[in-house]
Amino acid sequence: MQQVVYVANPVSGLIHVFRLEDGELVPLQEVQTGGEVQPLVISPDQRWLYAGVRPDFRVLSYPISADGRLGAPSSAPLAGSASHTCTDGTGRLFFAASYAFDHVSVSPMDDGGRVLAPHQRIDRLMAAHSVTWLAGQNGEQELLVACLKEDVIRRFTLNERSQLEPHPLGDIHTAPGAGPRHLTLHPTNGDLYCLNELDCTLNRYHREADGRISARESLDMLPEGYQGKRWGADLHLTPDSRFLFTSERTSSLLTLFGVDQEDGALTPLDHFPTESCPRGFAIDHSGHYLIATGQRSRSVAVHRIAAQTGELSLSSRHPVGEGAMWVRVLRLDKPA
């Protein structure tokens, strides 16, 4: 399996491009973005890497070459600083959440896959921290927006003009003071997971066939008796959906949860140290490695994931730019 890893370093303004080989990162390229580069997302057809940049608010569309290196980008304006981005399932639309500007924007793409200027902005989404595209088993589609300061996950549908409208079934409310931050979706069982930044809990929800979303459970991410500041960051499932990992920035811990294959219930299993202040991480497509950055570290860590238990062991560390935050992994030899 051939894989490429992209790491965004906002303080340095760099995207580091690596080849992942047996738990090691082999440098391929350093790309200067000309700004504070933060959220990264790969297009559904894997031909583009989209990078949000500030303070000149824009998105850069980088063409991805056959070996994973990035070509010269096109540039399009954004309505504000992007804290998180995603595309729809077809690669026609680009969504950007702005935590600082309390909005979500919708940008079309041209026929080649380049992001264009936004055609819609929805304001008054307090601390809109992330955008997550959800496609149901019956063809329904919606956008989930985690609004940290509202303790609400906003739900939107797309109309025939490719614009967002409030979902007729309403929004999802978290516990007061939880601070919903990032979401991830189970690929088959209808469950979705929300990492809450402020109280460091992990919520599991279930989406019914009729579109209703209901809460199933909420678990603490941190070790029993933890007394430090709570500052949750990121979460990801392994490709086989047997394990889920979260990161917390004060303790610099990665937490491992088991996912029951029958009913989806979560079980906290263990905690593992990683780079200082792990703002972002990713799991490779084989499910063998977890790649973690640290905002207060100048290195990125590659952890090996034990196949049977999910336990982490450090495989390697590699130097990167300052303030590393975002990690994305591309599989070059993905089957058609």
Predicted regions and their residues:
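Short loop/turn segments immediately following the C-termini of beta-strands
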Residues: 10, 54, 99, 109, ...
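Beta-rich, blade/repeat-based domains predominating
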Residues: 34-45, 78-94, 121-140, 174-190, ...
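Loop-centered beta-sheet repeat module
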Residues: 144-201
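Short loop/turn segments immediately following beta-strands, especially the blade-tip
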Residues: 18-24, 62-68, 107-114, 156-164, ...
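Structural signal for beta-propeller blades
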Residues: 14-15, 57-59, 102-104, 151-153, ...
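An edge-strand/N-cap motif at the start of beta-rich repeat modules
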Residues: 1-21
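A short beta-strand motif characteristic of beta-propeller blades
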Residues: 26-32, 71-76, 117-122, 167-174, ...
